[in-house]
Structure formats: C-alpha cells, structure tokens
Design a protein with these regions (language model features):
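Beta-strand-enriched cores of mature, soluble protein domains
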Residues: 19-158
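Sec-dependent N-terminal signal peptides
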Residues: 4-13
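Sec/Tat signal peptide C-region and signal peptidase I cleavage site
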Residues: 13-19
Length: 158
C-alpha cells in the first residue's frame, strides 16, 4: 500500500509543471507612421502604427533581440497628453509572440512614460502574464515619421 501511495505522489509531482517567471529590461529604437489632426496651440489628435527592435540587458531573456509592432493613439491638450493607449505584438526570437496593452502620458515632440500589462501570447507563452514600466524619448529622423528610443522593464510569468 505504501508503494502505491508513493507512486501516486511521485507521478503527481513529476507531471506538475512549474510556471516560469523572469524579469526583463529591454531597450531599442523604432519608427512609426502618424495620422494627426492639428487644431493649433498644442492641441492635436494622433494615431500611430510603428515598429521597434529591442535588446535586453540580460542576453537570453525572452524579449532579447525581439521586435515589437505597436498601434496606438493620444490626444495633446496644450502640448501635453495623459491618455495614450495602445497594443503591441512582440515577435520573439523563438518564433512565438507576446501581446501587451499600454497606457501613457507625456509631452508632444519629446516623449512619455507609461505602464503596460502583458495580456497573452502564442505557443508556450499562451498564458503569459505580467506588467511593467515603459518610457520613450523622441529622436530626429526621416521627415513624415516619428522616431524614438524605447525602454521597457517588467516581470512575467508563463
């Protein structure tokens, strides 16, 4: 009887998979196309669609050498915004994807800061969750596009 009980406990433990978790601190640069309605005096509505490449300070992190595609928008009032929202897809080196929703605030033409929530993914990251902080500093580049340095840090579990 003890052997059977031990076998049941052993099989239960050996089939139990522990969730993996980690931290990340990724940075990179990107560009995005803009649609804008300018009402003057620093009042403007903007939507954007852009891409960026990221490297993590920890080589081998799931976000290291990833790219992200983001679609979002914001409304400037007297040159400031506090309503930026959007969604990003991260294309990971292993071929999988991770999705986030984000919110932010900042100053038009300069950049902003915000928070994000990891909402899911594909494959082994299907049930990924997490959250973090992001910042963006606008930089000069090709006319007609917006360009920025991006930084994202946070934690995840899958």
């Amino acid at each position: 009887m003890k052997k059977i009980l031990f076998l049941i406990i052993f099989l239960t433990i050996s089939n139990y998979s522990l969730a993996e978790s980690g931290k990340f601190n990724a940075a990179g640069a990107g560009s995005r196309s803009l649609n804008a309605m300018d009402a003057g005096n620093g009042n403007m509505s903007i939507t954007y669609d852009g891409n960026a490449g990221l490297m993590d300070k920890e080589p081998g992190s799931i976000f290291d050498k990833s790219t992200m595609h983001c679609i979002g928008g914001l409304t400037l009032v007297s040159g400031k915004f506090d309503d930026e929202t959007g969604m990003c897809t991260f294309y990971l080196m292993d071929g999988e994807k991770v999705y986030i929703n984000y919110k932010g605030k900042g100053t038009g033409g300069q950049g902003g800061t915000g928070t994000f929530v990891i909402i899911g993914g594909t494959g082994k990251y299907e049930n990924i969750s997490g959250s973090g902080f992001s910042s963006r500093q606008n930089i000069r580049g090709k006319a007609g596009m917006a360009h920025s340095m991006n930084q994202m840090s946070g934690e995840y579990t899958y």
